[in-house]
């Protein structure tokens, strides 16, 4: 009876005196599990959607968190079984309590290191997104090869950081930009850590640009939406200033204050690049383009070849009247690759002279407006 009474007293002393630490360990372990799940969810999202690679420090932390959670849960089970055992001594409780305090500090310390601004990095496959465009098709690159090659060369030299592509709508600016973007990704980024595509258009929305950039660089913090524009810019600058990036801005109508958005200016040290498309030479000046590339309309011979490729040479030559009208239709495209490809493909199913004459009439009375990439 005395022995049982002593064990009961021992348990009462432990439960009464040390229960706070048990509660703290339970709480800290649950909080660590929640944080671990949040980090893993972020990592998996970027790995699955953008084929990025988790940072080594994040992987190490996840392993440490898993081990700490497992050991803490085992310790809590042991404590529960020990407190219900009649054979437990005051000495064994003291030993367990020392281990409990040590484990509590470990769990809290690991939890304190679980806040990551960035959880992923370039895996060598691509941190950007392939833009939708069948850029390997010959019918789309006729007349654009030289410009695409020139932009690509600018991407490989250190003395040109900002490149502006300008020309009238439909001349193929977005198509060239798409080609370079996809080529970078196909070449495993060619030394760039981030490849970022932003569609700008009219009425510049700096916040939208910041949100697009932060998604591409792997920054996903719950507090992002509550940050001010300046705070967002600071986070973007903090990350991009340490990495080499290629930023593609499509359809720029007016100056975009990239410094205000948090984008570090490209220079010979960071070797980053900013490439944008615009209809205006003036915008090129305002954006500080070090290299300006004007895209011209195609000369007639190349325009006619591009049109025939898309309409189908057999159809174009199938009837003398079709050939004559086809040349007039192609001329209405005014040397614009986008118009030549789009209308050419639309005419590929027209096999009678009358269908071609009808199309020519429509083009003559209601000329379409072409802009965007050649798809």
UniProtKB/Swiss-Prot annotation:
Entry's Gene Ontology BP terms: defense response
Function: Potential disease resistance protein.
Coiled-coil spans in chain: 17-49
Record carries keyword rRNA-binding: no
KW Ribonucleoprotein (keyword) present: no
The NB-ARC domain, residue ranges: 158-372
Gene Ontology cellular component list: cytosol
GO MF, one example: ATP binding
Organism expressing this protein natively: Arabidopsis thaliana (Mouse-ear cress)
Keyword annotations: ATP-binding, Coiled coil, Nucleotide-binding, Plant defense
Name of the protein: Putative disease resistance protein At3g15700
Residues reported in the UniProt entry to bind ATP: 167-174
């Amino acid at each position: 009876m005395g022995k049982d009474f002593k064990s009961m007293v021992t348990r009462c002393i432990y439960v009464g005196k040390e229960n706070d630490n048990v509660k703290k360990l339970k709480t800290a372990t649950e909080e660590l599990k929640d944080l671990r799940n949040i980090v893993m969810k972020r990592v998996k999202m970027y790995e699955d959607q953008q084929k990025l690679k988790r940072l080594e420090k994040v992987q190490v932390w996840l392993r440490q968190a898993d081990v700490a959670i497992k050991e803490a849960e085992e310790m809590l089970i042991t404590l529960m079984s020990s407190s219900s055992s009649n054979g437990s001594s005051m000495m064994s409780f003291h030993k367990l309590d020392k281990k409990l305090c040590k484990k509590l500090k470990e769990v809290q310390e690991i939890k304190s290191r679980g806040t990551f601004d960035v959880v992923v990095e370039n895996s060598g496959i691509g941190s950007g997104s392939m833009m939708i465009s069948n850029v390997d098709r010959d019918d789309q690159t006729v007349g654009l090869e030289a410009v695409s090659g020139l932009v690509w060369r600018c991407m490989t030299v250190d003395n040109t950081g900002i490149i502006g592509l300008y020309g009238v709508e439909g001349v193929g600016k977005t198509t060239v930009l798409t080609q370079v973007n996809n080529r970078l990704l196909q070449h495993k980024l060619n030394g760039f850590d981030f490849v970022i595509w932003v569609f700008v258009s009219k009425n510049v929305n700096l916040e939208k640009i910041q949100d697009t950039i932060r998604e591409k660089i792997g920054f996903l913090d719950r507090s992002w939406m509550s940050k001010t524009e300046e705070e967002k810019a600071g986070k973007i600058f903090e990350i991009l200033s340490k990495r080499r990036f290629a930023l593609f801005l499509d359809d720029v109508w007016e100056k975009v204050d990239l410094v205000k958005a948090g984008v570090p200016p490209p220079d010979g040290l960071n070797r980053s690049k900013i490439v944008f498309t615009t209809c205006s030479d003036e915008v090129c000046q305002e954006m500080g383009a070090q290299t300006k590339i004007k895209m011209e309309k195609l000369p007639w011979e190349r325009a006619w070849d591009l049109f025939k490729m898309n309409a189908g040479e057999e159809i174009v030559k199938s009837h003398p009247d079709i050939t004559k009208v086809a040349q007039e239709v192609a001329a209405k495209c005014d040397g614009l690759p986008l118009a030549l490809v789009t209308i050419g493909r639309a005419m590929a199913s027209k096999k009678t002279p009358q269908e071609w004459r009808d199309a020519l009439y429509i083009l003559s009375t209601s000329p379409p407006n072409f802009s965007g990439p050649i798809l």
